[in-house]
């Protein structure tokens, strides 16, 4: 037969037989199976333990007789002896002790059978155990460091205490709380506990035991007062060495405990036994009166106030007992205190300026508020925060208190030190009914504090839908911004209150309001930062934008507006420039008219002299015809020698006469020119370009403006008669063939006729080019770019006259088209026009620009070479000068097509210094009246300030380039800024997602 398991159920046959006392069955089971004698159940108990629990002595004896283990413990570590002592069965206890049961065995809590024996009123078990307990094991301690004496004092067993003390138990052993057996005896509520206290104190009557303090500083008197055991208190205080007012760790005395718990007789007893004139206060500065007032113990308060040493003093926070009573709603105590002391200061303030009415309003004690208002309490008393009792009531939502305070004269329009009204505090507390009461009392629903926050923003911060709805129903504006630019929608989105967001948008809250901080966040940005997905989705559905999107839209609009502004500004500047040019043109025209008037006066003075010039021209024509006829007849041999001599003499006389007249005429013109130059009034208003000729008495060579040396005989000498004589001698001894002369004369006449017809054609083409000249006049940039382009083309063009070469540089060509006013003085000198002025009639095949634009004024430039200046005597005819036929072969190909004109020839040769030198090469008939060689005349022409216009154009160009760079830089910065914030937002979003959804373990 196999053995039964050790952990069988409680209903095993042998255990059932043991607990029921069925000895027959028990013996039969033991006989059939001896192994079941110590069989354990689920609790580890054996049949012997069950026989003890069932008080079955016969079964226990049978089990012990058949070899049951007497000291075998159960699962809690207790043996059959523990169970016998716990039940108080001294017969079984004696049986077990006789079978050598261990009385010092401890269970899992270190409890012995001696500890358990103190639970019963009968002392027989304790006596048996003390008889078998060794002397040193009487004070065996359990896990709480308590001995059998502690247990006896706790269960109020005075006889057990005497037995244990008689067997040498120590009454001064503290347990884990620092309490000795006297603490446990004094803390019993039974009045008979005084006997146990007396037994313990008589065992060792010392002051140290009487005033022993546990680890919290409490003495047996504290515990006796705490349990309200008046007999024990009277007994303890009756001993001479007892301290009536000991302090615990919180500096509270037994009187504090009595006042707090409302033990009026004990408080009266302690006041009688207290020999100190002062009532001590605890660590908070509170006296027993404070605790009695807080506990609503009017009798105790009356007892305390009747003692002469008790006064209503303030605690460390400055609060009196009346404030404590008002805060707890101790109406009876308040009435008692006001009754005992009619002059009590009801409006006395604490450390923070609060009164008893503040405390009652904060806790919502409506009855106390009414009592205080009836006893002269100020309804609008303010504390250090400038809060009245109404503020406290609104914050906590006490509607009845608010109505009572308003009825008692409290003002609803006051604000605290932060500028907040009671409505702000009601909204912060989420009290919708209080908000309605305050609005009904004419308080502004849009009142702003010193930070600009409204009650609606306070309610939105907490997500209080009821308050928000009440405020907006009463016309509260949801779009009001605080000092940082935040609205109620910002706070709702920041905290993720979807219902509040829906409510605000339903009342037309602006979803894209930006704050005033550096970040300029919108409500959507706050929702994104908080990761509130539902709020984000709802805001996007209602047109919300982030600050990045708003900046993109604003940048696009700003650029469009700025471009329009730039166009308007450029148009206005161009308009101003044209108006300025028009003013300059009108001024130049006025100066021109003034010069013409002066010229008319001069022409009237020279009319008589003009007649001499006309007669001289007619004489030249006749002389030319005579020379032609003479040459023809001489080579044909038809005339005789005498006739030839007579004709030669006659011709010489005529030529000499003509040259003398011409010399006189030139001298007169030079004197007139000198007079004009010496006139200071005319010199101030006229700037004319003076053409230099070769002075008499200079060296054999003369430097031309182009840098080449020209022989002296190339200039027209100051002595025309001598020059004419030399020419006559040359023509007499070196006479060309008549065919050559006639051919040359006819060629010149044909060219003259072609020049006239070509001039008419050029006039028509010139009218067509006037529009392009006007565009050139309005666009200086094109002229400057053209000059730079010609400069880069850079190959010098050379012209030849005889064996001399004239170089035409790109700067000369630019000067010909743009005017010499665009060149500096050094450039003019280097180009050969520093003295003469312009060479555009030589280098350019195109007609010169209009006199009003280019040739309005010619300046007098003093030559540094020492040559005598002469006055220019012509105006380029027809606005387009042509090059002469004499230089046609040596000029570039694009100049060779130009027809000859005598006036243009004179002016051209005068510019380059060849006028007088090549005059004898042309017949006198070709050089008509008004040419350089026959007429001297001064003409005043006003120049347009080209350099000033160039400076304006360059300045405009630089300004446009600077703006383009700034615009490009601004675009780059905006793009970088948007990229940065997009990256930052995406990083935050990924970070939040990674925190919310951590990666799964692989």
From Swiss-Prot:
<dbReference type="InterPro" id="IPR036770">
    <property type="entry name" value="Ankyrin_rpt-contain_sf"/>
</dbReference>
<dbReference type="InterPro" id="IPR002110">
    <property type="entry name" value="Ankyrin_rpt"/>
</dbReference>
<dbReference type="Pfam" id="PF00023">
    <property type="entry name" value="Ank"/>
</dbReference>
<feature type="compositionally biased region" description="Basic and acidic residues">
    <location>
        <begin position="609"/>
        <end position="621"/>
    </location>
</feature>
<feature type="repeat" description="ANK 6">
    <location>
        <begin position="177"/>
        <end position="209"/>
    </location>
</feature>
<feature type="repeat" description="ANK 7">
    <location>
        <begin position="216"/>
        <end position="246"/>
    </location>
</feature>
<feature type="repeat" description="ANK 8">
    <location>
        <begin position="250"/>
        <end position="279"/>
    </location>
</feature>
<feature type="repeat" description="ANK 14">
    <location>
        <begin position="451"/>
        <end position="480"/>
    </location>
</feature>
<keyword id="KW-0217">Developmental protein</keyword>
<feature type="repeat" description="ANK 10">
    <location>
        <begin position="317"/>
        <end position="346"/>
    </location>
</feature>
<feature type="compositionally biased region" description="Basic and acidic residues">
    <location>
        <begin position="643"/>
        <end position="656"/>
    </location>
</feature>
<feature type="compositionally biased region" description="Polar residues">
    <location>
        <begin position="687"/>
        <end position="706"/>
    </location>
</feature>
<feature type="repeat" description="ANK 16">
    <location>
        <begin position="519"/>
        <end position="549"/>
    </location>
</feature>
<feature type="domain" description="IQ 2">
    <location>
        <begin position="966"/>
        <end position="995"/>
    </location>
</feature>
<feature type="compositionally biased region" description="Polar residues">
    <location>
        <begin position="670"/>
        <end position="680"/>
    </location>
</feature>
<protein>
    <recommendedName>
        <fullName>Inversin-B</fullName>
    </recommendedName>
</protein>
<feature type="repeat" description="ANK 13">
    <location>
        <begin position="418"/>
        <end position="447"/>
    </location>
</feature>
<dbReference type="GO" id="GO:0005737">
    <property type="term" value="C:cytoplasm"/>
</dbReference>
<keyword id="KW-0879">Wnt signaling pathway</keyword>
<feature type="compositionally biased region" description="Basic and acidic residues">
    <location>
        <begin position="770"/>
        <end position="796"/>
    </location>
</feature>
<feature type="repeat" description="ANK 1">
    <location>
        <begin position="9"/>
        <end position="39"/>
    </location>
</feature>
<feature type="repeat" description="ANK 12">
    <location>
        <begin position="385"/>
        <end position="414"/>
    </location>
</feature>
<feature type="repeat" description="ANK 3">
    <location>
        <begin position="76"/>
        <end position="105"/>
    </location>
</feature>
<dbReference type="Pfam" id="PF12796">
    <property type="entry name" value="Ank_2"/>
</dbReference>
<keyword id="KW-0040">ANK repeat</keyword>
<feature type="compositionally biased region" description="Basic and acidic residues">
    <location>
        <begin position="733"/>
        <end position="763"/>
    </location>
</feature>
<feature type="region of interest" description="Disordered">
    <location>
        <begin position="862"/>
        <end position="886"/>
    </location>
</feature>
<dbReference type="GO" id="GO:0035777">
    <property type="term" value="P:pronephric distal tubule development"/>
</dbReference>
<dbReference type="InterPro" id="IPR000048">
    <property type="entry name" value="IQ_motif_EF-hand-BS"/>
</dbReference>
<feature type="compositionally biased region" description="Basic and acidic residues">
    <location>
        <begin position="586"/>
        <end position="599"/>
    </location>
</feature>
<feature type="repeat" description="ANK 5">
    <location>
        <begin position="144"/>
        <end position="173"/>
    </location>
</feature>
<feature type="repeat" description="ANK 11">
    <location>
        <begin position="352"/>
        <end position="381"/>
    </location>
</feature>
<feature type="repeat" description="ANK 2">
    <location>
        <begin position="43"/>
        <end position="72"/>
    </location>
</feature>
<feature type="repeat" description="ANK 9">
    <location>
        <begin position="284"/>
        <end position="313"/>
    </location>
</feature>
<feature type="short sequence motif" description="D-box 1">
    <location>
        <begin position="486"/>
        <end position="494"/>
    </location>
</feature>
<keyword id="KW-0206">Cytoskeleton</keyword>
<feature type="domain" description="IQ 1">
    <location>
        <begin position="551"/>
        <end position="580"/>
    </location>
</feature>
<comment type="subunit">
    <text>Interacts with apc2. Binds calmodulin.</text>
</comment>
<dbReference type="GO" id="GO:0005856">
    <property type="term" value="C:cytoskeleton"/>
</dbReference>
<keyword id="KW-0963">Cytoplasm</keyword>
<feature type="repeat" description="ANK 4">
    <location>
        <begin position="109"/>
        <end position="140"/>
    </location>
</feature>
<dbReference type="GO" id="GO:0005516">
    <property type="term" value="F:calmodulin binding"/>
</dbReference>
